[in-house]
């Protein structure tokens, strides 16, 4: 209808678009509102630094200013100018790239810098400055040249890190590895409210608003093991469902009776917070409740990573979700995990790829794992076996 856009009330949509539209122009139009030398009561880099989406000539650098991280960041409602440096050595005696970037209140004072003109397949060190404060020194690595054949590519993948279920003890082990890249396959956070008698407790109830989602990411990123792994390696990230809501499928909520307006308004909050906290390029900037996260990442002629999004475009889970026999809607030719556009993009990339290995960085199990007992064979309808026609198309490639 004329009163809605993306299923969201027009007034809310216009307010959102006015906010995000102002961001690229901020450096031009808001010079008088930019704070160049802020003073902080505490360390503004409590959430550390990160890098991601490596290319042969560059990488994304990330930080977020939050002197009081659990008090919604503790930043004033104004833009702050940060300075960044990239060097070939940890002492920064050979700085090869530097510049400034605005930390905008509209994006929770997060900073995303796309650095280019770097050498391929090389380690670099980076840091941010704001006022008289300096961030921890991050380490990152560019990808090999597209026509190069490196001897090896070493990467680790992580996923499904539930804060309440335990400490992130895998990360200190990962930090000891000689890695080129960390790939996160989704469920970076969990959206559930805090539970008693768990190892750790989420702050607040189930998250819904933008401040809620920001707080949850903040709580996770304050974990020292996670923060340190971000500091040490570039990351390639994608989401699954819990960055928004359990088992959602495109525009369909797991719960019955959720209006499209509420669903999309919440998805908009979730997607914006995800972008704010991840080292992503501007090409992934969210547009309302939509965000293009699927993308490629090539490591020379050795490996070609295809990063997938199996949530935003899929059809509803068949047979009422959960674990069910492979019958009925499982074989619906219209059933899709990726959506037409993403599947076409993926197949085109695979056809064009000349790399030895094509790696699908994606969220859910491809193999049909029987979760039943005896002759009662049951499979997760939320995973690829629930989308059997789509699965077979991909495996036939």
Question: What are these model-predicted stretches?
Answer:
Residues 1-25, 32-397:
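Metal-dependent phosphoester/phosphodiester hydrolase catalytic core
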């Amino acid at each position: 209808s004329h009163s809605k856009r993306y299923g969201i009330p027009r007034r809310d949509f216009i307010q959102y678009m006015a906010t995000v539209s102002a961001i690229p122009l901020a450096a031009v139009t808001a010079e008088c509102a930019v704070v160049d030398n802020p003073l902080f009561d505490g360390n503004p880099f409590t959430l550390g630094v990160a890098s991601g989406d490596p290319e042969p000539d560059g990488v994304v650098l990330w930080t977020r200013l939050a002197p009081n991280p659990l008090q919604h960041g503790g930043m004033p409602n104004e833009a702050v100018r940060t300075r960044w440096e990239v060097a070939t050595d940890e002492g920064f005696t050979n700085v090869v790239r530097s510049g400034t970037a605005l930390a905008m209140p509209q994006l929770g004072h997060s900073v995303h810098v796309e650095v280019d003109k770097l050498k391929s397949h090389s380690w670099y060190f980076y840091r941010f400055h704001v006022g008289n404060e300096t961030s921890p020194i991050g380490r990152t690595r560019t990808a090999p040249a597209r026509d190069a054949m490196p001897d090896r590519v070493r990467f680790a993948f992580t996923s499904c890190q539930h804060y309440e279920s335990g400490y992130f003890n895998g990360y200190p082990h990962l930090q000891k590895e000689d890695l080129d890249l960390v790939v996160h396959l989704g469920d970076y956070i969990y959206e559930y409210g805090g539970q008693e008698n768990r190892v750790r407790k989420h702050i607040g109830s189930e998250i819904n608003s933008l401040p809620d989602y920001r707080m949850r990411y903040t709580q996770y990123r304050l974990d020292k093991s996670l923060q340190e792994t971000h500091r040490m390696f570039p990351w390639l990230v994608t989401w699954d469902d819990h960055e928004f809501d359990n088992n959602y499928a495109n525009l369909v909520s797991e719960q019955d009776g959720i209006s499209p307006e509420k669903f999309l308004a919440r998805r908009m909050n979730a997607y914006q917070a995800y972008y704010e906290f991840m080292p992503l390029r501007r090409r992934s900037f969210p547009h309302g409740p939509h965000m293009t996260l699927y993308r490629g990442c090539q490591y020379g002629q050795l490996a070609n990573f295809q990063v997938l999004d199996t949530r935003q475009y899929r059809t509803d889970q068949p047979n009422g979700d959960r674990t069910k026999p492979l019958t009925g809607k499982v074989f619906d030719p219209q059933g899709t995990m990726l959506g037409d556009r993403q599947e076409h993009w993926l197949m085109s990339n695979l056809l064009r790829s000349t790399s030895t290995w094509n790696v699908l960085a994606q969220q859910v199990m491809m193999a049909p794992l029987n979760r039943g007992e005896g002759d009662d064979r049951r499979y997760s309808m939320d995973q690829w076996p629930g989308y059997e026609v789509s699965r077979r198309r991909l495996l036939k490639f």
